[in-house]
């Protein structure tokens, strides 16, 4: 059905247009700012539906999770862990930190020992991760990690960060990942956590390693696209700001309650 446009309607539309043009001409900057602000608010609502803004941390945080943490490496340089642990905003505090320990065959993060010690001393739960290099034999990488990290009771299980395949097929990558996981589990007595991005997971790892806990990176989503993955941790942003840390830092949530977090740390299997 087509609407008939009368002369009166045409006149009204013309007057409205002239009025808008006059406002823009008289207040150009204010008009642009108004429309920009409105557009930003609409965009924020679309992108962050299910999130809530937390001003001090400079990001939106998923609203339905209560346990928050960060992950750090040499890129954050020297961290003031006392300030990190004291930070609070709107009932949100940081309860855990994943810390890069090693990478590939030889690389040990230069800040690992300091971060590992001070995060625990300031009351945060801590976990150590190894960045997996597909070009290096898995046993070599596992030994480097185990020689570097001194686990204590109350620490998270070891974490394997798998983000690249290199020249390997997906099948060969999974074989090497499995070798690392089994070696580290045998040594530590706990099943390691596997970290990966959502896209890489779907392409290379989906349907495998279901017996292991997962930590998935997927930004600006209401929930991570997990394709049936039983994820424990979700890295939802890489732009957080935290007292005591220079620059941006990754933010994560734990998928569970305080009791489930403690059971996870203790290595207690939940009753189905």
Curated annotation (Swiss-Prot):
Gene3D superfamilies xrefs: Glycosidases
| InterPro entries, A to Z | Glyco_hydro_25 (IPR002053), Glyco_hydro_25_AS (IPR008270), Glyco_hydro_fam25_subgr (IPR018077), Glycoside_hydrolase_SF (IPR017853)
**Example GO molecular function:** lysozyme activity
Q: Which Pfam families match?
A: Glyco_hydro_25 (PF01183)
Q: Does the keyword Hydrolase apply?
A: yes
SMART domains (alphabetical): Glyco_25
Q: Does the keyword Zinc apply?
A: no
Active site residues of this protein: 163
Alphabetically ordered keywords of this record: Glycosidase, Hydrolase
List this protein's GO terms for biological process: carbohydrate catabolic process; cell wall macromolecule catabolic process; peptidoglycan catabolic process
Signal peptide residue numbers: none
Superkingdom assignment = Bacteria
Q: What's this protein's family per the entry?
A: Belongs to the glycosyl hydrolase 25 family.
**Descriptive protein name:** Uncharacterized protein YegX
Report the source organism. Answer: Escherichia coli O157:H7
Taxonomic lineage of this organism? Answer: Bacteria, Pseudomonadati, Pseudomonadota, Gammaproteobacteria, Enterobacterales
């Amino acid at each position: 059905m087509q609407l008939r446009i009368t002369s009166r309607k045409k006149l009204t539309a013309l007057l409205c247009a002239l009025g808008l043009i006059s406002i823009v001409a008289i207040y150009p900057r204010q008009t642009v700012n108004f429309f920009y602000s409105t557009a930003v608010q609409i965009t924020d609502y679309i992108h962050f539906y299910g999130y809530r803004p937390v001003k001090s941390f400079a990001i939106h945080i998923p609203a339905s999770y209560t346990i928050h943490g960060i992950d750090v490496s040499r890129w954050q340089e020297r961290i003031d862990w006392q300030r990190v642990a004291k930070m609070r905003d709107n009932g949100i505090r940081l309860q855990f930190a994943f810390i890069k320990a090693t990478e590939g065959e030889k690389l040990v993060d230069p800040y690992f020992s300091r971060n590992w010690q001070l995060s625990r001393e300031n009351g945060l739960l801590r976990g150590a991760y190894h960045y997996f290099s597909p070009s290096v034999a898995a046993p070599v990488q596992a030994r480097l990690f185990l020689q570097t990290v001194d686990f204590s009771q109350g620490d998270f299980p070891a974490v394997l960060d798998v983000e690249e395949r290199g020249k390997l097929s997906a099948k060969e990558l999974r074989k090497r990942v499995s070798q690392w996981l089994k070696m580290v589990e045998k040594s530590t007595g706990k099943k390691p956590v596997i970290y990966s991005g959502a896209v890489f997971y779907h392409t290379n790892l989906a349907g495998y390693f279901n017996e292991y806990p997962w930590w998935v990176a997927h930004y600006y989503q209401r929930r991570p696209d997990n394709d049936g993955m039983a994820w424990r941790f979700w890295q939802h942003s890489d732009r957080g700001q935290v007292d005591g840390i220079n620059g941006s830092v990754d933010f994560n949530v734990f998928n569970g309650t305080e009791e489930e977090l403690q059971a996870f740390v203790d290595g207690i299997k939940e009753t189905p």
